[in-house]
């Protein structure tokens, strides 16, 4: 019987500087607003992109609210990666006043 892998969590306001931040939201959410240093891989594409993710450092995984990122962090941890879920997601990121950029030149926001 497979059991979910326990993954640590962090609130976006407490995210250390310089981490590898993996954003697993959909393309339209990413375009609307994301952390400047984040790397975008849609949740549905994680399996195909697994080999391109760093295996030698912690991956902080973020989505809009923390649910998809929790699933992604557990799935990646089950494959041997060291993951941390950003439990309040980009919604918490915006509330904490952390920087955001958009891909389409509009005012960044959480979609």
Model-derived regions, located:
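Short, surface-exposed ligand- or partner-binding patches at beta-edge/loop junctions that are enriched
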Residues: 62
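Rhodanese-like catalytic fold shared by cysteine-dependent sulfurtransferases
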Residues: 1-20, 26-58, 67-111
